[in-house]
Amino acid sequence: MSGQKYQLVSLLLIICLLFSQSTASGCNFKGSCRTDDQCKRICRGHGLDPSFQLCVPYSSKGGKCCCLHYEGAPLSSEVI
């Protein structure tokens, strides 16, 4: 029984480590904003598809909007 617990814990740890790795290529800081909706409009305005984005008002950068584009996600100008 003890061996099964270690196997289960090991499996859960591996799963958590695999799925917690970010595939984001980094922030593209665009414009200034105070809300998530403003940030989404800014990301859209720069040709980045918000369905593949994480738009975050980033206050420590002077209210800049972080348009986070994931690797492999097409830009809105690209044909899928």
From Swiss-Prot:
First and last residue of the signal peptide: 1-24
Statement: the UniProt record of this protein carries the keyword Signal: yes
Any coiled-coil regions, as ranges: none
Alphabetical GO biological process terms: defense response to fungus; killing of cells of another organism
Compartments it resides in: Secreted
Disulphide bonds in the chain: C27-C67, C33-C55, C39-C65, C43-C66
UniProt GO cellular component terms: extracellular region
Keywords: Antimicrobial, Disulfide bond, Fungicide, Plant defense, Secreted, Signal
Family: Belongs to the DEFL family.
Protein name: Defensin-like protein 276
Organism: Arabidopsis thaliana
